[in-house]
A protein has these predicted regions:
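Conserved catalytic-core motifs of eukaryotic protein kinase domains, centered on the activation segment
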Residues: 60-68, 104-108, 157-158
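C-terminal substrate-binding subdomain of Rossmann-fold SDR/epimerase-dehydratase oxidoreductases
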Residues: 175-177, 181-285
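SDR active-site strand-loop-helix element
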Residues: 17, 53-54, 93-99, 103, ...
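NAD(P)H-binding glycine-rich loop region in Rossmannoid oxidoreductase-like domains
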Residues: 41-72
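N-terminal Rossmann NAD(P)H-binding glycine-rich loop of SDR-like oxidoreductase domains
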Residues: 3-31
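Active-site helix of classical SDR
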Residues: 124-127
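NAD(P)-dependent short-chain dehydrogenase/reductase
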Residues: 133-188, 194-199, 203, 230-232
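Conserved Rossmann-fold NAD(P)-dependent oxidoreductase catalytic core, especially the SDR/UDP-sugar
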Residues: 78-120
């Protein structure tokens, strides 16, 4: 770090951890806030304001590396908090979390309701939220927690059947390949374009109260199977869409239906500009 950097940086500048990931890279490129992209091996924030995107992204790691979710979502996060606190007496930490923390519960999910996460990913994300709240109370720091819906959009390099399954299936439809949908795709999700995520994050960072939790999604329940079938029809795809039983492990770690109550963020003036549709999915080509 340049010795004069801390003296010259704008007090509003945000240090972005996870700046090369799907959402983090979009935030660095398109946020209206001044930002500094932290390198992968850096754990000490260059500024008093932090936004933290680093994390695992699905519930399947337990089958191959049972410690990964703990190491990434908890240990590394705490290392960043502690290293940054030694440099800055005041910190404002924004943790980007996930709707997965809600787990089994009434929908639409509200920020105030009890969380009951199911899989290792979900549990460690919720634990990170609680650790952040406790850490900030212990050391007199400030936080925000943002629970995202299912994010879609261009630039996601880690698409798979486990993570961002919607775009994984869209790609197969584009190639006229068959797709398998659990229970015919009769599941509900809350999809939000990454462009709207960046806009929502900016609003929260600049207009919201500190020490609060915000849902960031469309607030619209979307039937995934219906959406995919409409897309296949409108694009004249030759894909066969098959229905299959949901694997037991999937039912253990995920809920069937989920979407977010977005009243709180809408009170800041947030509106969706790119709702999910066949057209916004075509734009991913």
């Amino acid at each position: 770090m340049h010795p004069n950097y801390l003296l010259s940086v704008d007090k509003h500048t945000i240090s972005v951890f996870g700046s090369t990931g799907f959402i983090g890279s979009h935030f660095v490129s398109f946020s209206k806030n001044p930002v500094v992209a932290m390198k992968r091996d850096e754990i000490q924030s260059l500024t008093k304001r932090i936004i933290y995107f680093i994390g695992t992204n699905h519930n399947y790691n337990v089958l191959e590396n049972y410690l990964l979710d703990v190491q990434v979502n908890l240990v590394h996060f705490l290392e960043v908090l502690n290293a940054s606190r030694t440099l800055h007496k005041e910190l404002e930490i924004t943790l980007v979390s996930s709707w997965f923390v809600y787990g089994d519960g009434e929908i639409p999910y509200k920020e105030s309701q009890h969380c009951n996460p199911k899989g290792f990913y979900s549990i460690t994300k919720y634990t990170a939220e609680m650790l952040l709240q406790s850490y900030c109370k212990t050391f007199g720091l400030n936080y925000r927690i943002i629970r995202l819906g299912n994010v879609f959009g261009p630039g996601d390099k880690s698409i798979s059947s486990k993570k961002n399954a919607l775009q994984f299936l869209i790609r197969r439809i584009q190639r006229n390949e068959s797709i398998d949908l659990y229970e015919g795709g009769d599941i509900i999700r809350d999809f939000i374009h990454v462009t709207d995520v960046v806009h929502g994050l900016d609003l929260i960072l600049n207009k919201s109260e500190l020490n609060q939790i915000y849902n960031l999604g469309s607030g619209v329940p979307t039937n995934m199977g219906k959406l995919l079938k409409e897309y296949a029809k409108e694009t004249n795809s030759g894909s066969l869409i098959n229905s299959k039983a949901t694997p037991e492990f999937h039912t253990v770690v995920q809920v069937k239906n989920a979407y977010l109550d977005t009243e709180k963020i809408r009170s800041l003036g947030f509106e969706i500009s790119l709702p999910i549709s066949s057209q916004t999915l075509k734009d991913l080509l």
